[in-house]
Amino acid sequence: MDKTLKLLILCLAWTCSFSALRCAARTYPPVATNQDQVIKFTTEGATSQSYKQFIEALRQRLTGGLIHDIPVLPDPTTVEERNRYITVELSNSERESIEVGIDVTNAYVVAYRAGSQSYFLRDAPASASTYLFPGTQRYSLRFDGSYGDLERWAHQTREEISLGLQALTHAISFLRSGASNDEEKARTLIVIIQMASEAARYRYISNRVGVSIRTGTAFQPDPAMLSLENNWDNLSGGVQQSVQDTFPNNVILSSINRQPVVVDSLSHPTVAVLALMLFVCNPPNANQSPLLIRSIVEESKICSSRYEPTVRIGGRDGMCVDVYDDGYHNGNRIIAWKCKDRLEENQLWTLKSDKTIRSNGKCLTTEGYAPGNYVMIYDCTSAVAEATYWEIWDNGTIINPKSALVLSAESSSMGGTLTVQTNEYLMRQGWRTGNNTSPFVTSISGYSDLCMQAQGSNVWLADCDNNKKEQQWALYTDGSIRSVQNTNNCLTSKDHKQGSPIVLMACSNGWASQRWLFKNDGSIYNLHDDMVMDVKRSDPSLKEIILHPYHGKPNQIWLTLF
């Protein structure tokens, strides 16, 4: 009897262990192989929704983990060659189809199959021809996959090549035909790369394609789209190598009007258009996503921690953290002051690896650990060490770990002394690092591709029109969203409860209901209330945007349109 019981217990333990291992394995999605189910998209009867589902499936297959809550491709050093490629089947209304091979380590198109023949870009990895399209007759194309080479062979730039369903339908038919026209091959591959790979990388680009499908109109890439395509590696590197919310190098994008957009911080609103990053390195001591298996994380490249950026710190009403009157004597107060036209010492702060924040070699220091204590400049060696330590969170909060209090600009007046306060995610407690502290001006697209529009103190959705001032919004360093018609008015939830309408109210109080975070899931998130902006009942005719718990449906998805 005892032996039987022991045997039963042993079997149960083995079963539970195996089950636990199996369940744990499910936590980590396997890297896709070209033998897995092919992702498909057809232009026949295509809708913006079917295209969205295709892009979401492609993103999911390409995702290897999360860094700073943003999906990232697998680290190339952890991917076996046999698992390096996935295939996408594209078909058109004439029932012609091709398969496209994509490298999971960079989301590049490396080859395509047309019937019994396959064609590999000149710079395709050597292993691509081994693992992609077995049993086909293989050919090497005369050009590589870079836009520079593709444009040379196409005798057209990306700006000159139309995108949309008609262009994709033609691309499928032409490549399926096996015609030997290299110029047209290059042109059609530019179409496919942008409508698949680039759309998987950026929400902005997938949105442009989706609008094109919904309206039945072709489009050419605008300057904003091209600048995103040209800076994917830079944006990915900026996010992953960021120190205390700050990029190691500015990333210069372009607006649709060809105005420079300087992205220098994780909390910059444009980072939210990234849907999928190139893997560059793992941030040191970062909390890794559960998608990343521990052994893989340990083998992955770790970002350098030696970088110590010197930057401005922008906050309430776009003012800068400033050493009062350029005085560096111990105990001199720190104030909020208009950011100067030139970079000057008393508004420049070095974010040190020891968690101190220094100006002219002296430390930003809290006078004490009670709410309301003022913040001062102090000699780093003689100050109480814990009073000089700060963490800058991805959401723009600057916190003193010892006290758990946050940096706050309680006064709306220029020259107001900065203090530490209980963290309530107030607008006056929001900050953004970087030397470009100007508001980012953009339109904001939402449900049914309509744009957010100010109408007096009300806010609703209307047909997008770049020329309408009512649809232009200034996104400030404090997390506020302001109508460019009157930047003293902020988007504000009337109350802290579900269903509260979003309206325009005076920014002067710096409330929590006026601080917003653009997230990579497409939501505009209120940190204090843990809710997001929501088009009421998914019905723009109600002319009401409300506060609502996040569920991820289309009426909660927003996008800055540069």
Swiss-Prot record:
2-gamma repeats lie at residues 529-562. 1-gamma repeats lie at residues 403-435. It comes from the Eukaryota. It catalyses: Endohydrolysis of the N-glycosidic bond at one specific adenosine on the 28S rRNA. GO terms for biological process: defense response; negative regulation of translation. The modification Pyrrolidone carboxylic acid is found at Q35. Keywords: Disulfide bond, Glycoprotein, Hydrolase, Lectin, Plant defense, Protein synthesis inhibitor, Pyrrolidone carboxylic acid, Repeat, Signal, Toxin. The active site is at E198. 1-alpha repeats lie at residues 317-359. Disulfide bonds join C281-C303, C320-C339, C363-C380, C451-C464, C490-C507. 2-alpha repeats lie at residues 448-483. Glycans are attached at N234, N395, N435. Disulfide-linked dimer of A and B chains. In the N-terminal section; belongs to the ribosome-inactivating protein family. Type 2 RIP subfamily. The B chain is composed of two domains, each domain consists of 3 homologous subdomains (alpha, beta, gamma). The A chain is responsible for inhibiting protein synthesis through the catalytic inactivation of 60S ribosomal subunits by removing adenine from position 4,324 of 28S rRNA. Abrin-a is more toxic than ricin. This is Abrin-c. The lineage of its organism: Eukaryota, Viridiplantae, Streptophyta, Embryophyta, Tracheophyta.
